[in-house]
Amino acid sequence: MPYFDIDNGRLHYRRLGFGPALLLAFHGYGETADVFTVFEPHLQDKYTILSINLPHHGLSEWPKDTYLQPHHLSTLVAQAATLHGVARISLMGYSIGARVCLALLKAAPDKIDTVLLMAADGLSINPWYYFVTRTLIGRLLFRSFLAFPAASLQLASLLRRAHMISTSYYMLTTQVLQHNATREQLRLAWPCLSRLVYRPEYLRAVISRHSVKLLLFMGSRDRVLPPRLGRNFTNGLNSAHFFVLEKGHRIFDAANAAQIAKHLLQ
């Protein structure tokens, strides 16, 4: 099976297509590299897609309690470019995978051609995520939240009834807390990716300075990452193109993959 060896970890990837240009793709939380197969028929002539399994997802092997750091992403880009024999690459990311793309863009901006992001995380700093992954009190509360799922579900229900969290967040919380495997994945994956958070003004400056083509798709019915985040992020960026699709957070599927892919082919 194909892997990129990154320090003490191994990131598994799936190869899709056979085109001359290289596209690295990063899936959303709780998914695998297989999610991007819907794009293969539309991109395979122009791109070879290396769809990466994030740490603690799919067949990737990553040490527990080890952060995915910016220098790991630089190593990944260098290995992928050498493997494919190219000097520059493009990126595609969905949800938390979009945050990885933005961090990769920050780590190696001179190596990036086009960035396609869908239902993108990382367009703003989420104070709750920062609190539970970057502060001592937050980390302790996060571990307690996962250690006592029954009590945490009751708390989440109260917060939803008090309109302190949305129904979408409540449903996500319920899905995660119901099973040991999903709780363990969250315990490992959320902190692992917490070092890939940057201020949006800094990311915008990198995109502007290097004239990186940014294609950003957000869902009009997305309650997790609403389209206003994308509108605010792209405002004033000359190389950015912003699109709103009539979708929720699951913004792409076999029905609209061609519509999204055509913008990478232009």
Task: Annotate each predicted stretch with a short phrase.
Residues 245-259:
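Catalytic histidine-centered segment of alpha/beta-hydrolase-like enzymes
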Residues 9, 15-59:
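Conserved HGGG/HGGXW glycine-rich cap/lid loop of the alpha/beta-hydrolase fold
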Residues 221-225, 250-251:
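Acidic catalytic loop of the alpha/beta-hydrolase fold
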Residues 210, 216-218, 222:
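Short beta-strand/loop motif that positions the catalytic acidic residue
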Residues 51-94:
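Active-site loop/oxyanion-hole signature of alpha/beta-hydrolase fold enzymes
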Residues 106, 115-145:
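Flexible "cap/lid" loop of the alpha/beta hydrolase fold
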Residues 147-208:
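Conserved alpha/beta-hydrolase catalytic His-Asp/Glu region
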Residues 202-204, 212, 226-235:
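Short alpha-helix in the alpha/beta-hydrolase fold that links the catalytic acid
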